[in-house]
Amino acid sequence: MPDIPVYMVVNLSITAPDSYRIYEKGFFGFLKQYGGEFITYDDNPLTLEGEAPRAGRMIIFRFPSEQAALDWYADEEYQALSENRRAGTRLEFLTLVHGLPPRN
């Protein structure tokens, strides 16, 4: 069975912009290293039904497989960089959403 892409959905509020900026500058290199692709972010998402997302930024990016996403997240250098995100944001969630397998 081929790998199925996964999507990372993140909701956070930036509380210390300088710390978050350090994280942001290093983030894209790690994302690329693991085959990840930045999809989008939105500081004002529109909720059509249900409770609105928590305050802050919604971010979506993609990995080619669950294993690639888990390897990215477990990378020791990435985790060291993530200390800047932790110091500079209030994280509501960081969630993996599985994509659909290819259709024949």
Model-inferred region functions:
Residues 37, 81-82, 93-96:
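A short linear hydrophobic-aromatic micro-motif
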Residues 86-104:
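C-terminal end-helix/capping segment
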Residues 70, 77-88:
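C-terminal structural segments of small proteins and small subunits
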Residues 1-74, 98-104:
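Short S/T/G/P-rich N-terminal loop/turn motif that feeds into the first structured element of a domain
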